[in-house]
Swiss-Prot record:
This is Glucose-6-phosphate isomerase. The lineage of its organism: Eukaryota, Metazoa, Ecdysozoa, Arthropoda, Hexapoda. Changing residue 471 to A: In strain: JA-S. Its main location: cytoplasm. It catalyses: alpha-D-glucose 6-phosphate = beta-D-fructose 6-phosphate.
């Protein structure tokens, strides 16, 4: 790749966008744009054709963009060298510059035969060997060959991890519940003992398998939870040998794993070129395999590989991750939008927004460029959301009539896994999905509100007083993503779509999307504070607020 990028706000293409925004862009009205162009939907939407899972539709026509804006945004992507950065990632270059690592979660789902090189070594043989190990173990557990210490078949799987070792597997197992193979999945992440205690109340030691997910096998929260789970098991089994029947490890630290009591043959590894928030495709996905079966896990990989190929080979103007990324830059850096809402209209996707809170905010929540200089423009947005229609009765009020601009992605399947009441529920759900994006775009004018109130029998002061409250400004931007059905393949494609969107935005902002130093400071300070909670003496070594909090907690400890 060429030399360092200039600061984004000094890029000529960015400055042209700023000029256009100031003169015309800020006044673009989505409703008017549809009136002026009868072909707007076909111009600003695309369909991705899968082999067996139908089409994936991305409709981005309900955005504050026109041809001029779009051409300028595409130019920005080109001058920020998104193509070169994408190729560098897929080719195994060390694009994680602060940790000197390659970024190759895409290799984990590489379904082709081409080699993938990291430091001149093809990693695919190791990837395939680990997948084969996962397949063998998964089939043993699901078939009942693997049994607990008393000879009973495994019925429950408890994944103990945190961050990327928890959020991804949890989200996917919830999303793909219709494909479950009969095992009950549980997840423990929080160091709060309540999390583990409540899970242990639900399971039987004779039929429970614990997965300890920690690359180093030293992660404080994970190892503390795993050790307490081990103590619980031994209190019931009374046999140290039972640990090897009820615990497996997702780790690369053989010494620590065997010291814990886990047979090293039941240790599943991954590599330093796999970031935590991109690790569900690796051995970290073992809990997914046990939930949905290895064949369905392969379909998840296939879907992600499909999106990888789309991202690698498709021109920017038809490239779904690039399109979503550029729209986000448009709103973050010009309209000063601070948040982005992910709104899946499918209950199985109820953890999707939480998963991409980490995926986006941990990746692009950075204030310095790759060269270490503070940036003078906005970077990663605050990402949040809930499933529809729950969100409609909670926070949509602010999206519709609040003072903040909140771009939204609406996600829905055309088909449901649960067509109860003859499909009535799903029809109501989809009617709301469709109505919300139309309402956010069109709003309700003063005249429309007045007519509506008049028809309801209001007049005079009563009508005039209520009228302002019934007006919707509209012009709220949305994307709509529709899949045929939430399947392992389409879910894999959706996850990869957002992964690559985040990557493209990081390139445009010239930040490193693959480290997370912001996680470290609080952990360092917690280690210093923890010993201060061991004694009853008042503490005075911190600021007055922290001292006061520590001393209050200690006074109320018992």
């Amino acid at each position: 790749m060429a030399g360092p990028l200039p600061p984004l706000n000094q890029e000529a293409a960015f400055q042209k966008l700023q000029e256009y925004y100031d003169s015309k862009g800020k006044d673009l009205n989505i409703k008017d744009l549809f009136v002026k162009d009868s072909k707007r939907f076909s111009k600003y939407s695309l369909r991705l054709h899968t082999q067996n899972d139908g089409e994936i539709l991305l409709d981005y026509s309900k955005n504050r963009i026109n041809d001029e804006v779009w051409d300028l945004l595409l130019t920005l992507a080109k001058v920020r060298r998104v193509n070169a950065a994408r190729d560098a990632m897929f080719s195994g270059q060390h694009i994680n510059i602060t940790e000197n690592r390659a970024v190759l979660h895409t290799a984990l789902r590489n379904r082709g035969t081409d080699p993938v090189l990291v430091d001149d070594k093809d990693v695919m043989p190791d990837v395939r060997a680990e997948l084969a190990h996962m397949k063998e173990f998964t089939n043993m557990v699901i078939s009942g060959v693997w049994r607990g210490c008393t000879g009973k078949q495994i019925t429950d799987v408890v994944n103990i991890g945190i961050g990327g070792s928890d959020l991804g597997p949890l989200m996917v197992t919830e999303a793909l519940k219709p494909y479950g193979k009969g095992l009950h999945s549980h997840f423990v992440s929080n160091i709060d003992g309540t999390h583990l205690a409540e899970v242990l109340k639900k399971v039987n030691y004779e039929t429970t398998l614990f997965i300890v997910a920690s690359k180093t096998f030293t992660t404080q929260e994970t190892i503390t939870n795993a050790t307490s789970a081990k103590t619980w098991l031994l209190e019931h089994s009374k046999e140290p040998e039972s640990v090897a029947k009820h615990f497996v490890a997702l780790s690369t630290n053989k010494e620590k794993v065997t010291e814990f009591g886990i047979d090293s043959t039941n240790m599943f590894g991954f590599w330093d070129w796999v970031g935590g928030r991109y690790s569900l495709w690796s051995a970290i996905g073992l809990s997914i395999c046990l939930s949905i079966g290895f064949e369905n896990f392969e379909q998840l990989l296939d879907g992600a590989h499909f999106m990888d190929n789309h991202f690698k080979t498709t021109p920017f103007e038809k490239n779904a991750p690039v399109i979503l990324a550029l729209l986000g830059v448009w709103y973050s850096n010009f309209f000063k939008a601070e948040t982005h809402a992910l709104l899946p209209y499918d209950q199985y996707l109820h953890r999707f927004a939480a998963y991409f809170q980490q995926g986006d905010m941990e990746s692009n929540g950075k204030f310095v460029s790759k060269s270490g200089k503070p940036v003078k423009y906005s970077t990663g947005p605050i990402v949040w959301g809930e499933p529809g229609t729950n969100g409609q009765h909670a926070f949509y009020q602010l999206i519709h009539q609040g003072t903040r601009l909140i771009p939204c992605d609406f996600i829905a399947p055309a088909q449901t896994h649960n067509p109860i009441a003859g499909g009535k529920h799903h029809k109501i759900l989809l009617s709301n999905f469709l109505a919300q994006t139309e309402a956010l775009m069109a709003g309700k004018t003063v005249d429309e509100a007045r007519t509506e109130l008049s028809k309801a029998g209001l007049c005079g002061n009563e009508l005039d007083n209520l009228l302002p409250h019934k007006v919707f400004v509209g012009n709220r931007p949305t994307n709509s993503i529709v899949v045929k059905k939430v399947s392992p393949f389409t879910l894999g494609a959706l996850i990869a779509l957002y992964e690559h969107k985040i990557f493209v935005q990081g390139i445009i902002w010239d930040i490193n999307s693959f480290d997370q130093w912001g996680v470290e400071l609080g952990k360092q300070l917690a280690k210093a504070i923890e010993p201060e909670l061991d004694h009853c003496n008042e503490v005075s070594t911190h600021d007055s607020s922290t001292n006061g909090l520590i001393n209050f907690i200690k006074a109320n400890w018992k």
